[in-house]
């Protein structure tokens, strides 16, 4: 089933590098999980309460099992958070990030009722695309790989076999005609550009060919003597500094959808045959408009494929390129893993239904396009996997959740591994049920107590209107409050949470955003209004997740305002009290005094604002003397320690342009939640500006 490739994967061991040692429930959980998985259990569930260190447990488990691992997260933000934490703990292994590369995506659709065709429109994030290619490259070249992915991993990707077949292997001493090498690069979808040297392009200078692989930040230089490869070097694309030499380099294609000439011919023949068949069906049914539309669109796409090797919406023809039978599942990221890989599904109560629901939503939209002649029926096979297909392609699976869903519990017969004792000794919050009469006055009283103690409060309501009204009312009373809702963009959301932590305001009001993955140690009170209104926002799982937001504070409390105790409330309170009793008993037995969680508050957003003002002033001064600015070369410097040294070789005008470009990159990195990259760029900009000021004082041009 899985294609066998000739490429050799390097076999470095998984290794956790950290000052931490397993504590609380972690040692027992790691031991039991390893025992079950090594014993061949197909499914295992870790019931890990909020703040018990599930990420660290996963890292130590991977080190113990020594198996490539796929971690699936419910959204991009949690995937980035998990990947960053794993990278810190496993610095010598390949921890990759694989999520949808669209910043904005409007899928192709047709609305028959109004005869409206909506063309596909999207904006691709190049850095995320690089990380996707980096993930597939790592999977095919090394065994010590962990990929943290969103549900994007069950969507179609080119076949790993074709990806490897199109790969170019270059070795020192190898004989190859230079023009043949350039032809190979073009077939792999690389573009020649001798002026703007960016990712996915190559340039030629005499017998030297330089490429920036689409999955890398560094360039590869191939030096030839005649038809023989003399040297292979890795270099920095901006400074040209040589960072290393190799005897062999693999260059993977610039696209996951790449096909050789023979496969392209077969695919085009298949598309044309399907077109004739479908046109006959439409004409027989009297659908002449649909037939004409399909003929025009498909003929144009075929011409583009013949001339350019690709076309808009090429993924809709993936079945023909892969040589798959109608109705067969697509190739996905799962096919790039070795046979023995482990799957970890985090926040499984959300992620499992999400994986299961992707297929139907996609099929409903495509069905309309096919019926009305916008696409061939084979477009239906460019789709996500169904749940059953996903299960067939995955082996052993570990489900992580503070509130495992019915599917996971059924798979293990309710026999879960528990991790409810926190290494810090913190216990689950005390839950208090209060009547709804006078609830707002009581809430205001509780908020004032917390504000005096410099603690924070989360308030969760049922409707947007109620959240807005409550925010206005609290503001009128002089309480520092903000409202978090779905229309706030991602970066502003991160900023709001940070402002809550540092104390810019004391209360955050929300609806359904105060649940999975929010890490707020300063919050000592979570108030749940209308806790007795049954529905998905007040189900047992939702309540336990919301209660968990107060579990990172020594004196955390949850106040539920309700007139009756529903079954969901009773179950959530009972489970919280069970965990709390177990945690208190453990602390008493081991003499542990709960320690407040001190988690560093990221200063990235704050420093971006300061950096902006400083950069604007410096650039204005620097530009005042000369008109016109050269376009700086793309990329980022390799590290702040070498920046000042490298900058000495740049003229002042070019240095100012580089500062401006890196500032843009810093903002983009922050917007993409790549905070480590943004912080690194911030440090580089500081070094460059120091050099620029020095040149300014010395009067150097």
Curated annotation (Swiss-Prot):
Domain UVR stretches: 656-691
Domain Helicase C-terminal: 439-605
A cellular component term, taken from the record's GO annotations: excinuclease repair complex
Start and end residues of each Helicase ATP-binding domain: 35-422
CDD domains: DEXHc_UvrB (cd17916), SF2_C_UvrB (cd18790)
Compartments, record wording: Cytoplasm
NCBIfam families, alphabetized: PRK05298.1 (NF003673), uvrb (TIGR00631)
UniProt note: domains: The beta-hairpin motif is involved in DNA binding.
Protein name: UvrABC system protein B
């Amino acid at each position: 089933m899985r294609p066998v490739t000739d490429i050799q994967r390097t076999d470095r061991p998984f290794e956790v590098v950290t000052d931490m040692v397993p504590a609380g429930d972690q040692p027992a959980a790691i031991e039991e999980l390893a025992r079950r998985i090594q014993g061949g259990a197909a499914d295992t569930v870790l019931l890990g309460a909020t703040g018990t260190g599930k990420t660290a447990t996963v890292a130590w488990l991977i080190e113990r099992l020594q198996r490539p691992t796929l971690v699936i997260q419910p959204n991009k933000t949690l995937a980035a958070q998990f990947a960053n934490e794993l990278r810190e703990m496993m610095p010598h292994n390949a921890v990759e990030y694989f999520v949808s590369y669209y910043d904005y995506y409007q899928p192709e659709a047709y609305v028959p009722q109004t005869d409206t065709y909506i063309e596909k429109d999207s904006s691709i994030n190049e850095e995320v695309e690089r990380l996707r290619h980096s993930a597939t490259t790592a999977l095919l070249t090394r065994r010590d790989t962990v990929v943290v992915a969103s549900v994007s991993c069950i969507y179609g990707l080119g076949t790993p076999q074709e990806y490897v077949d199109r790969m170019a292997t270059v070795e020192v001493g190898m004989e190859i005609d230079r023009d043949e090498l350039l032809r190979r690069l073009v077939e792999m979808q690389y573009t020649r550009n001798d002026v703007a040297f960016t990712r996915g392009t190559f340039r030629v200078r005499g017998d030297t060919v330089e490429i920036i692989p689409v999955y890398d930040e560094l360039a590869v230089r191939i030096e030839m003597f005649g038809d023989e490869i003399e040297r292979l070097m890795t270099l920095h694309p901006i400074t040209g500094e040589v960072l290393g030499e190799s005897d062999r380099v693999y260059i993977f294609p610039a696209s996951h959808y790449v096909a050789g000439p023979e496969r392209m011919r077969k695919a085009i023949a298949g598309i044309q045959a399907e077109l004739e068949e479908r046109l006959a069906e439409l004409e027989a049914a009297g659908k002449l408009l649909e037939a004409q539309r399909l003929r025009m669109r498909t003929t144009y796409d075929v011409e583009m494929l013949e001339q350019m090797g690709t076309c808009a919406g090429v993924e809709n023809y993936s079945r023909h390129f892969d040589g798959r039978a109608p109705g067969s599942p697509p190739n996905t990221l799962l096919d790039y893993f070795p046979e023995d890989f482990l799957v970890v599904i985090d926040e499984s109560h959300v992620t499992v239904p999400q994986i299961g629901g992707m297929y139907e939503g996609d099929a409903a939209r495509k069905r309309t396009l096919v019926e009305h002649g916008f696409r061939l029926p084979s477009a239906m096979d460019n789709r996500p996997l169904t749940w059953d297909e996903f299960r067939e392609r995955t082996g052993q699976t570990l489900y992580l959740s503070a509130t495992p869903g019915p599917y996971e519990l059924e798979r293990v017969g309710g026999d879960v591994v528990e991790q409810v004792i926190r290494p810090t000794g913190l216990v689950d919050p005390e839950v208090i049920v209060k009547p709804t009469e006078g609830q707002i006055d009581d809430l205001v009283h509780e908020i004032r107590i917390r504000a005096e103690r410099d603690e924070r409060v989360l308030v969760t309501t049922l409707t947007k209107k109620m959240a807005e009204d409550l925010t206005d009312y609290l503001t009128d009373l002089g309480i520092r409050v903000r409202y978090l809702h779905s229309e706030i963009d991602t970066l502003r959301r991160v900023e709001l949470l940070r402002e809550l932590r540092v104390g810019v305001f004391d209360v955050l009001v929300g609806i359904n955003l105060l649940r999975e993955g929010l890490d707020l140690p300063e919050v000592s009170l979570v108030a749940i209004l209308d806790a007795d209104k049954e529905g998905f926002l007040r189900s047992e799982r939702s309540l336990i997740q919301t209660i968990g937001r107060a579990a990172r504070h020594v004196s955390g409390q949850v106040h539920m305002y309700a007139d009756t105790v529903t079954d969901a409330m009773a179950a959530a309170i009972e489970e919280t009290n069970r965990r709390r009793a177990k945690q208190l008993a453990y602390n008493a037995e081991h003499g542990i005094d709960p320690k407040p969680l001190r988690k560093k508050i990221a200063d990235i957003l704050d420093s971006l604002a300061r950096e902006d003002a400083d950069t604007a002033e410096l650039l204005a001064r620097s530009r005042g003397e000369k008109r016109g600015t050269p376009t700086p070369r793309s990329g980022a410097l390799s590290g702040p320690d070498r920046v000042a040294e490298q900058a000495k070789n740049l003229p002042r005008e070019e240095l100012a342009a580089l500062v401006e470009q890196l500032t843009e990159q810093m903002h983009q990195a922050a917007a993409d939640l790549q905070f480590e990259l943004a912080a690194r760029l911030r440090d580089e900009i500081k070094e460059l500006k120091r050099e620029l000021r020095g040149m300014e004082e010395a009067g150097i041009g």
